Regions:
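Long, charge-dense, solvent-exposed interaction surfaces that engage phosphate-rich ligands
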Residues: 2
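ATP-dependent carboxylate-amine ligase
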Residues: 5, 9-17, 29-39, 46-52, ...
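Active-site "gating" loop of Rossmann-like NAD(P)-dependent oxidoreductase/epimerase domains
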Residues: 20
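A Rossmann-like FAD-binding core segment of flavoenzymes
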Residues: 55
């Protein structure tokens, strides 16, 4: 699974991406390793009138003596695309425990949507809101920003409201800097709103480097009430995707309520 887990390839709408999984299984010390080759195709897309996040999964197993094919019976609403990797890992782990592919696929297809505030996607007027306010860490932040950068199911224009990631200890400044740099590289970026001293302390130091021209798009917020609602009509004059994310103690869900009340 190593190549699979470290792959940075992501799917684009109506295109496939293929991952080869090579497994060497040692069954008792007296037997030869059993090698099975797995190929998985993930198809992502958005049906007309629906929200982004619909996927199809297809497995192809090839061994020395046979070849078999399995696929999901219907589209799956997995939310962020990194959940495809999670789903594939779950399917293959279940197989090692004796669960049939057909049963695993049926169970995954029962998955409807993430839990509240965990990458919940909704339409607000003509815009797409991603409510990922339950919590945040460097991996989850990087994943969702990467999703915004590569998933053409979302509108081109992007607005980010980002709160600090807490409990990172000595790595806090480095990890916040990585996320801010990644966010500033997004195409179609309209603005970034930052809540919390960890992100805000980086603004000046980063401003002196590669993104000085972009910092007229970055705003520091002390409280939810500081959000410049009057700017929304200018920033979101076209169809946009809006991400709201931060650690639990940052109370980022308050921004979701603010957007719902002012964008309808």
């Amino acid at each position: 699974f190593e190549d699979w887990c470290t792959s940075d390839k992501l799917m684009e709408m109506n295109e496939n991406f293929r991952v080869n999984v090579h497994r060497n299984l040692q069954r008792d010390s007296a037997t030869k390793p059993l090698t099975e080759n797995w190929s998985c195709t993930v198809v992502s897309g958005q049906e007309e009138g629906s929200l982004p996040g619909l996927f199809g999964l297809s497995f192809q197993q090839t061994s020395n003596s046979s070849s078999r094919h399995f696929q999901s019976p219907k589209k799956i609403n997995l939310g962020p695309r990194h959940n495809c990797h999670n789903a594939l890992m779950a399917v293959l782990a279940a197989r090692e425990l004796g669960v049939k592919f057909s049963e695993s696929m049926e169970r995954i297809c029962e998955f409807d949507s993430p839990l509240p505030d965990r990458y919940g996607i909704e339409h607000i007027g003509k815009h797409v809101l991603i409510n990922d306010t339950y919590n945040a860490n460097p991996d989850s932040f990087a994943s969702v920003i990467n999703d915004l950068a590569t998933n053409c199911s979302y509108p081109k224009n992007k607005l980010l409201i980002m709160g600090d990631m807490l409990e990172l200890g000595q790595y806090s400044e480095t990890e916040h800097a990585k996320i801010l740099e990644q966010a500033l590289r997004l195409d179609g970026l309209k603005a970034i709103f930052l809540k919390g001293e960890k992100f805000q302390n980086l603004i000046f130091s980063t401003q002196q480097k590669d993104h000085e021209s972009q910092f007229d798009q970055v705003y520091a917020l002390q409280e939810t009430e500081d959000f410049p609602v009057a700017l929304l009509s200018d920033l979101l004059d076209e169809e946009s995707v809006i991400l709201v994310k931060g650690s639990r103690k940052m109370n980022m869900e308050q921004f979701v309520d603010l957007l719902r009340n002012n964008l309808l």
